[in-house]
UniProtKB/Swiss-Prot annotation:
It comes from Solanum lycopersicum (Tomato). This is Chlorophyll a-b binding protein 3B, chloroplastic. It is a multi-pass membrane protein. Chlorophyll a 4 binds at N218. The chain crosses the membrane at residues 153-173, 221-241. Chlorophyll b 4 binds at Q166, R177. Its main location: plastid. Chlorophyll b 5 binds at Q166, F263. The gene is CAB3B. Residues 19-52 are annotated as: Disordered.
């Protein structure tokens, strides 16, 4: 250090004094200093869809610009979306989200089953019993539902027997989901994975995050459409696919307005 100081102050600079500690204004200059955040941007979801990514477009943006702190892309807890203020507290929001995911998964299966049964009937598979639309009436009748037209297959004479079987089966599955068992340990009870995910859809974390959002969104849609199926069946006495076929055949006459004055069910 001493040698460099002597070299700097030697006669090579022709008597010009060299400042070894220049002032701060000379270091930084007079330009404005701006600090820029260089954090990595979140990766878009694997499908590139604007609706299921982490920064999903909020459709209710017009109603309330400021999203609540609890609102993720999946559960929009804006004032308009949660009219009943069900997601006001964070703990309640988490519980409601768990219920929504479980009920949504059930509704997605139910809506598929309701449509599938009607599709099978339309494709001339001889289903002896009525479709799901009229099944509630048939279940209370003495003859009961003979699935797949074979009396010996699932010929449930008693609605209580059906109920007991459902309780046992669903109780076993839910018990595995919550407590673990021979199917594997529980990591996350809401999204159990393991044997509950035979296709391995949740192994990639990005795709898994996107699928969670899609599951909730499609589940809400399925719950609402299942409600619609029931209302249609009560009013028109037909299943959803029959109503759709009628509507496509004659969209002007066969639509909701034709039944808007019909308050006698199944007429």
């Amino acid at each position: 250090m001493a040698a460099s100081t002597m070299a700097l102050s030697s006669s090579t600079f022709a008597g010009k004094a060299v400042k070894l500690s220049p002032s701060s204004s000379e270091i930084s200059g007079n330009g404005r200093i701006t600090m820029r955040k260089t954090a990595a941007k979140p990766k878009p979801a694997s499908s590139g869809s604007p609706w299921x990514x982490x920064x999903x477009x909020x459709x209710x943006x017009x109603x309330x610009x400021x999203x609540x702190x609890x609102x993720x892309x999946x559960x929009x807890x804006x004032x308009x979306x949660x009219x009943x203020x069900x997601x006001x507290x964070x703990x309640x929001x988490x519980x409601x989200x768990x219920x929504x995911x479980x009920x949504x998964x059930x509704x997605x299966x139910x809506x598929x089953x309701x449509x599938x049964x009607x599709x099978x009937x339309x494709x001339x598979x001889x289903x002896x019993x009525x479709x799901x639309x009229x099944x509630x009436x048939x279940x209370x009748x003495x003859x009961x539902x003979x699935x797949x037209x074979x009396x010996s297959l699932v010929h449930a004479q008693s609605i209580l027997a059906i109920w007991a079987c459902q309780v046992v089966l669903m109780g076993a599955v839910e018990g595995y989901r919550i407590a673990g068992g021979p199917l594997g340990e529980v990591v996350d009870p809401l999204y159990p994975g393991g044997s509950f995910d035979p296709l391995g859809l949740a192994e990639d974390p990005e795709a898994f995050a996107e699928l969670k959002v899609k599951e909730i969104k499609n589940g809400r849609l399925a719950m609402f459409s299942m409600f619609g199926f029931f209302v249609q069946a009560i009013v028109t006495g037909k299943g959803p696919l029959e109503n759709l076929a009628d509507h496509i055949a004659d969209p002007v006459n066969n639509n909701a307005w034709a039944f808007a004055t019909n308050f006698v069910p199944g007429k």
